[in-house]
Amino acid sequence: MAQEKRGSRDDRQNREERDSEFVDKLVAINRVAKVVKGGRRFGFAALVVVGDQKGRVGFGHGKAREVPEAIRKATESAKRDLIFVPLRDGRTLHHDVNGRHGAGKVLLRSAKAGTGIIAGGPMRAVFETLGVHDVVAKSTGSSNPYNMVRATFDALKHQVHPKDIAAQRGLKYATLQARRAASGNASEE
């Protein structure tokens, strides 16, 4: 009975291939201090957003004494907590949605092809790693990057694919699409 070693080369290569599909963006880095008996001990905290640009995205927070280590920890944390967001035509959101975390509020609106990413700071990083090409976003309240990212994720978690809505209402997907086209909210093809 042959047992494979825990950290085998194949395992490492598979992990590297899996990690290579992700794009990561550094959103914020802070210098933090821990007060100890002899004075202050400085460290760094990093906020990173990771995504595959195909609808999966996550964010992570890492703290360490050195910047690269804090970024590495944040990236690993983000890869552990990925969410899937359904995209319309692989480029925008299906519907407008609000999100909130603490005092940070965001409004995300789907947009026509060619609009681009109209969003500020931390929200832009989320959309770029998610794979959204056309979106209009507005943030109000707190401008703290942590609150803005969490509020954006709150909004993205409320995105629902029209097929799921059709199933809940007991309708056919084609019927729902026809209603959407009739109301003028159809995607530009």
Swiss-Prot record:
Keyword Ribonucleoprotein: yes
InterPro entries from the UniProt entry: Ribosomal_Su5_D2-typ_SF, Ribosomal_uS5, Ribosomal_uS5_bac-type, Ribosomal_uS5_C, Ribosomal_uS5_N, Ribosomal_uS5_N_CS, Ribsml_uS5_D2-typ_fold_subgr
Membrane-crossing residue ranges in chain numbering: none
One BP annotation, GO: translation
This protein's record includes keyword Transmembrane: no
PROSITE patterns, per database record: RIBOSOMAL_S5, S5_DSRBD
A molecular-function term among this protein's GO annotations: rRNA binding
Domain of life: Bacteria
Domain called S5 DRBM: residue spans: 22-85
One matching Pfam family: Ribosomal_S5_C
Keywords: Ribonucleoprotein, Ribosomal protein, RNA-binding, rRNA-binding
GO cellular component terms given for this protein: small ribosomal subunit
Family of this protein: Belongs to the universal ribosomal protein uS5 family.
Functional description taken from the UniProt entry: With S4 and S12 plays an important role in translational accuracy. Located at the back of the 30S subunit body where it stabilizes the conformation of the head with respect to the body.
Record note on domains: The N-terminal domain interacts with the head of the 30S subunit; the C-terminal domain interacts with the body and contacts protein S4. The interaction surface between S4 and S5 is involved in control of translational fidelity.
Oligomer and partners: Part of the 30S ribosomal subunit. Contacts proteins S4 and S8.
Protein name as catalogued: Small ribosomal subunit protein uS5
Organism of this sequence: Agrobacterium fabrum (strain C58 / ATCC 33970) (Agrobacterium tumefaciens (strain C58))
